[in-house]
């Protein structure tokens, strides 16, 4: 039999096995319709990207589930893919072109998009090669890209159908406008951070009176678009002003005072300027009161010469001249000029420092302007024409969760989902970009819209009119929302669609419940009548060791592949400090990295990383990544490797009980480990079925490290050396069979090391029924093998081992010294413990006696038994050792007592520290007492 390498080296082993699995086709579904199906959707990572810790976390969980259900015999499919990531990708390529002195407008749309495709082909493989490194057992033959031809057809089909059902429309709406990118962006792409700003108090005179109102604002530059000033309906101070007109400073216009529940009378001055064309809250207020929308800003976020006036239905209602002095100024420039003019006219009453949340584009850092733009929308609360269900898209998705068709794990996320779904707005699906699915709509010269699957189809609807195509592309989330069925052959009724829709579970982070999860439920339910998945397992976010969010700008991002392969300090610093949005932070990031990783990051291997991630997968809570834990699990891999080598050296070429007809005599130790294995099988299965990967990892770790390696393997050494043939055969059989099953149990979490070891162990356990551990059956517990009697005996034995070890410690007997043990007991069966005790407690012999010898030696209790170690002690040397130890303990006691008696310490220090100190004090007193007793005995 091939010998296992002396030491565990993950790198080569991982590459070798992954290549073998992929080439052998093990990742493909069996398509055996007599078996239950298990399907899982990968949240498609951005094609621009590289794997980050969040990916490694959620891919560990997804792969763990896929491997678990594959071993359970299910027809298993995990579809991989990447997302075209509209904005992110376009920005990356634009930056690269800028380095060459080019921009997209000079190149034109066709040349620019072909550049992106070129770049995508080059870099798109990074993420998939990294997924291979993490061990993802996805069916690579079904890999998709959200802009490939198949997906493009589905996107067009869905758009056309929604348009024909009256659910897609074009309108003028307020959107998050990134002037640097020149596009509307989604709420997800807006990051609001607290910044230092000002609150300006401005005087708005009441027309025909010497009264005035004081409006507090953080954005005086939008004053040009004000349509009203609002007060709270219950603000009795100002109710007499409702309906009166105010002079709008700097404009020569007048605007009314209105009452609206949006206003908080306790905040600021109680007066709020209403600018519906430049603020989302004001938009809703304006809509309630039927005001106009006055747009004062261009798409470049500069003040217009003429403000455009619109109705809430999008109709153009003329224009008004704005003060010429502000035309063409940026928001910041206009603010400065207007404040100076307000000051000069005596209308600026006060300027106060004020902290405010400033919305910025997460990719550009540009301040986001709410702007009125022409956009395409999907109606969320309207029933489609001819829809027999009588439900809107949103209503279908709400019902799917309320009825339990879709379940959230943990279920507290249902409230978050419902809250959002029940207040849902129409979905803005257009983006003013060049990279993405171009909207399949055409316009004639009069602006009439023709939607078609192809230009020819649109042309047929338009008669002979000349058409021009819509330039906007669809929001990236539009194509992502279709993934549950666009990857399975829809609109055709394919075997894949039949077998794998509805999929079993979606594994994702909480931050995209609305943007992706809800939209998949809406679209899949609307177009197929089915829900996309039964369960939504929401996991927490992986943060750095201090609990900070990992981000490029913080310089605390960790590449999972660097944990797998290791990385030296210099390239790590370079990686963390290049491409920063704020390059001035580079020295600070370099310093922090050097402090945290003075020698770089060691190689932990994939299995240790995966096990770390699994151990962190508690329900829904964010986790702080600790390298010590990864190190601990790398040691666990070593432990498993070395234990397997020991087992193989002791059983290879010997009788391991493969011949079932030969006699077997199992000891209580064998029965105990076999029973513990059954319990581990039950616990790990339950944990994986309920997405408790943390519990699965804990059970596997404790069983393999503590019970199998630390106890059973040690005790098996005694049984292999002593005992008759039937006993030795039973021990060898137990060693290999328990290990083989433990490797199967651990395979979903640690696929590589378990496969390598299983190939060696399985033949000796009569378990090599399949080519690969991946295809081996999942262990099924036999509860009849759990012996309460064997468990009780083992607990009694462990207690005795610990009691003897404590005695040795108390007597200062070093590990090199063996000593005889006397056991006072009436229970003759304790004699069975002696051979094991000799090995584990370092004894020369163990003797059962009716009464312990009359001696000054310390006595320990273990159950009903009394234990004594008989050691000739050098009294003078032992007394000197104890006196030295006594002095040390007394010094520590004095120091700790002084600390606790220090005035104010107990009252002011954190409670957990005080408790810790008190516990330590009690421990030291106990230790001192034991030393004194020993000294008395020696004297």
UniProtKB/Swiss-Prot annotation:
<dbReference type="InterPro" id="IPR009080">
    <property type="entry name" value="tRNAsynth_Ia_anticodon-bd"/>
</dbReference>
<dbReference type="GO" id="GO:0002161">
    <property type="term" value="F:aminoacyl-tRNA deacylase activity"/>
</dbReference>
<dbReference type="GO" id="GO:0005524">
    <property type="term" value="F:ATP binding"/>
</dbReference>
<dbReference type="InterPro" id="IPR013155">
    <property type="entry name" value="M/V/L/I-tRNA-synth_anticd-bd"/>
</dbReference>
<dbReference type="InterPro" id="IPR002300">
    <property type="entry name" value="aa-tRNA-synth_Ia"/>
</dbReference>
<dbReference type="InterPro" id="IPR009008">
    <property type="entry name" value="Val/Leu/Ile-tRNA-synth_edit"/>
</dbReference>
<keyword id="KW-0963">Cytoplasm</keyword>
<feature type="short sequence motif" description="'HIGH' region">
    <location>
        <begin position="45"/>
        <end position="55"/>
    </location>
</feature>
<comment type="subunit">
    <text>Monomer.</text>
</comment>
<dbReference type="InterPro" id="IPR010978">
    <property type="entry name" value="tRNA-bd_arm"/>
</dbReference>
<feature type="coiled-coil region">
    <location>
        <begin position="876"/>
        <end position="939"/>
    </location>
</feature>
<dbReference type="InterPro" id="IPR014729">
    <property type="entry name" value="Rossmann-like_a/b/a_fold"/>
</dbReference>
<dbReference type="Pfam" id="PF08264">
    <property type="entry name" value="Anticodon_1"/>
</dbReference>
<dbReference type="Pfam" id="PF10458">
    <property type="entry name" value="Val_tRNA-synt_C"/>
</dbReference>
<dbReference type="InterPro" id="IPR001412">
    <property type="entry name" value="aa-tRNA-synth_I_CS"/>
</dbReference>
<comment type="similarity">
    <text>Belongs to the class-I aminoacyl-tRNA synthetase family. ValS type 1 subfamily.</text>
</comment>
<keyword id="KW-0175">Coiled coil</keyword>
<comment type="function">
    <text>Catalyzes the attachment of valine to tRNA(Val). As ValRS can inadvertently accommodate and process structurally similar amino acids such as threonine, to avoid such errors, it has a 'posttransfer' editing activity that hydrolyzes mischarged Thr-tRNA(Val) in a tRNA-dependent manner.</text>
</comment>
<keyword id="KW-0067">ATP-binding</keyword>
<keyword id="KW-0436">Ligase</keyword>
<keyword id="KW-0648">Protein biosynthesis</keyword>
<protein>
    <recommendedName>
        <fullName>Valine--tRNA ligase</fullName>
        <ecNumber>6.1.1.9</ecNumber>
    </recommendedName>
</protein>
<feature type="short sequence motif" description="'KMSKS' region">
    <location>
        <begin position="549"/>
        <end position="553"/>
    </location>
</feature>
<dbReference type="GO" id="GO:0006438">
    <property type="term" value="P:valyl-tRNA aminoacylation"/>
</dbReference>
<keyword id="KW-0547">Nucleotide-binding</keyword>
<dbReference type="InterPro" id="IPR033705">
    <property type="entry name" value="Anticodon_Ia_Val"/>
</dbReference>
<dbReference type="InterPro" id="IPR002303">
    <property type="entry name" value="Valyl-tRNA_ligase"/>
</dbReference>
<dbReference type="InterPro" id="IPR019499">
    <property type="entry name" value="Val-tRNA_synth_tRNA-bd"/>
</dbReference>
<feature type="binding site">
    <location>
        <position position="552"/>
    </location>
    <ligand>
        <name>ATP</name>
    </ligand>
</feature>
<dbReference type="GO" id="GO:0005829">
    <property type="term" value="C:cytosol"/>
</dbReference>
<keyword id="KW-0030">Aminoacyl-tRNA synthetase</keyword>
<dbReference type="GO" id="GO:0004832">
    <property type="term" value="F:valine-tRNA ligase activity"/>
</dbReference>
<dbReference type="Pfam" id="PF00133">
    <property type="entry name" value="tRNA-synt_1"/>
</dbReference>
<dbReference type="InterPro" id="IPR037118">
    <property type="entry name" value="Val-tRNA_synth_C_sf"/>
</dbReference>
